[in-house]
């Protein structure tokens, strides 16, 4: 396999330049994170994508700079104290770092959803605020503490630090080794109250119940105070990440990326995800296809929705995968975006080899992929819709006299509004009663509002439905006894309504 490295580097840099001006990125990095370091993106670092997020995306941009500087300086001091032992700690450090980092990314998305919800503060607190805070503490901070203590343990020959698992001892150890500032906003009383169900909610405040020194205690936070606690904790966590990233950039040789190439190993998989990511297009999943296929599956979230851009991105990542994992025989790539339908493109190893030998072969390779039907990528929906409505809308439970419609789902097409649902009629009734209920239910369901679809155009809104598909049962018992089989004693019948001119299915 002949590698045209200049071509490969240029592909990557071109994709990066589409998202952010490279010189501006370096300038912003120097102005906001490290004024001294000088690096070029032609020899790209895998840390570019998380750095981009912390430089340009909210709420990541609100990272605590004092925390970031403190973490960087203390990591640097520990490294200079005992470089050999520091490097030995890196595999364990990276394990905890990535557990924290992936948790953090999920929580950032949850926070964004929290601000878009139209639920009451009470429901939003139960669904989002409390889980966000407890996961910031247990998923992010506790693992970042463990990462730091792994380094301290190795460089100071303190093996007893390796066994600390619970939050309070972790906090005590951090304070003992002068990481006091990292413990601010870590409220163990609130954490214990959430973990043990000691919560009383209203739309104005949250009351936390916990034990302290053997006594029952409580504290109350107004909703705005809880939001402030979450934001401050998030900013501190962000600062810890920036401190680590700054250290990794300054000391690139402490991580031998060539060593971490096994997608089945968590740390290797995590590092590969970073290397297969760009600002705006991030790798979220890497697996080896089970069996003897030697296929690598790569999944991405992306802001790109144009077919030609997705094809080019897929080629860039397939080339990187071929270089880093040369034993694999094929590369299956999918992209996720709220405006895209499910898609994929599959490259064979020989496709990539042909491109690497001669970049002029790209059109031929792409044509071969399309010809053998190894590619399904459709245009993104360009319909102007309320994306938040499409994302968060929940169908209601419709009730009649003695019956309920639940589990309403939208299966509409561009030319037809179609709804399917489950109808529960309650106690055993006569055939005539059941028919009457089905007719009433269809009449009600016909007028049910359906939201737009973010991926493709459908008939939607308050207009009457063209088709209704009802599965009718006696009793609702969550996911039990809802098979559409004659042997299911709870199943009664399947009913379908279509406006005149529409064929039944």
State where each predicted segment sits:
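Extended intrinsically disordered or low-complexity regions, especially N/C-terminal cytosolic tails and loops
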Residues: 1-120, 259-397
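Short, mixed-charge amphipathic alpha-helical segments
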Residues: 74-75, 164-205
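Short, contiguous, well-structured surface segments enriched in hydrophobic/aromatic residues
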Residues: 124-171
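Short polybasic amphipathic segments
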Residues: 204-215, 331, 468-471
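Amphipathic, Lys/Arg-enriched alpha-helical patches that create a basic surface
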Residues: 208-260
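Short edge beta-strands and adjacent turn/loop segments
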Residues: 279-293, 394-425
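C-terminal partner/receptor-binding element of secreted or periplasmic proteins
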Residues: 397-400, 476-505
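Mature extracytoplasmic domains of secretory-pathway proteins
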Residues: 418-479
């Amino acid at each position: 396999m002949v590698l045209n490295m200049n071509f490969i580097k240029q592909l990557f840099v071109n994709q990066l330049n589409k998202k952010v001006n490279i010189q501006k990125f370096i300038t912003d990095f120097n102005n906001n994170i490290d004024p001294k370091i000088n690096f070029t993106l032609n020899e790209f670092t895998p840390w570019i994508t998380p750095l981009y997020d912390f430089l340009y995306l909210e709420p990541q941009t609100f990272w605590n700079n004092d925390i970031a500087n403190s973490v960087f300086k203390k990591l640097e001091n520990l490294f200079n104290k005992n470089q050999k032992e520091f490097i030995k700690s890196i595999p364990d450090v990276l394990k905890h770092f990535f557990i924290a980092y992936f948790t953090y990314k999920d929580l950032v998305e949850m926070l964004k959803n929290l601000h878009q919800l139209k639920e009451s503060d009470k429901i939003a607190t139960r669904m989002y605020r409390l889980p966000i805070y407890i996961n910031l503490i247990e998923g992010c901070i506790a693992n970042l503490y463990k990462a730091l203590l792994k380094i301290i343990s190795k460089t100071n020959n303190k093996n007893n630090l390796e066994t600390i698992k619970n939050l309070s001892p972790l906090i005590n150890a951090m304070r003992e080794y002068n990481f006091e500032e990292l413990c601010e906003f870590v409220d163990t009383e609130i954490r214990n109250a959430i973990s043990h169900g000691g919560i009383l909610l209203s739309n104005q405040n949250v009351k936390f119940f916990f034990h302290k020194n053997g006594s029952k205690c409580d504290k109350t936070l107004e909703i705005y105070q809880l939001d402030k606690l979450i934001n401050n904790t998030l900013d501190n966590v962000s600062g810890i990440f920036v401190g680590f990233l700054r250290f990794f950039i300054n000391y690139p040789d402490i991580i031998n990326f060539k060593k971490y190439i096994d997608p089945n190993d968590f740390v290797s998989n995590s590092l590969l995800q970073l290397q297969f990511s760009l600002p705006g297009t991030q790798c979220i999943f890497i697996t080896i296809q089970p069996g003897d296929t030697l296929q690598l599956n790569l999944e991405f979230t992306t802001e790109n929705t144009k077919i030609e851009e997705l094809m080019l991105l897929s080629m860039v990542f397939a080339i990187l995968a071929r270089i880093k994992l040369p034993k694999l025989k094929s590369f299956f790539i999918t992209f996720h975006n709220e405006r895209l339908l499910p898609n994929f493109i599959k490259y064979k190893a020989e496709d990539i080899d042909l491109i690497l030998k001669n970049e002029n072969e790209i059109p031929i390779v792409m044509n071969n992929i399309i010809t053998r039907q190894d590619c399904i990528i459709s245009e993104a929906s360009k319909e102007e819709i309320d994306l938040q409505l499409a994302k968060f809308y929940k169908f209601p439970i419709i009730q009649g006299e003695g019956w309920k419609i639940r589990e309403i789902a939208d299966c509409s097409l561009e030319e037809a509004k179609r709804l399917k649902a489950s109808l529960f009629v309650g106690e055993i009734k006569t055939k005539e009663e059941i028919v009457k209920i089905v007719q009433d239910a269809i009449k009600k369901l016909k007028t049910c509002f359906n939201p737009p679809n973010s991926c493709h155009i459908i008939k939607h809104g308050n207009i009457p439905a063209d088709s209704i598909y009802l599965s009718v049962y006696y009793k609702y018992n969550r996911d039990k006894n809802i098979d559409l089989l004659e042997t299911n004693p709870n199943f009664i019948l399947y009913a379908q309504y279509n406006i005149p001119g529409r064929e039944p299915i």
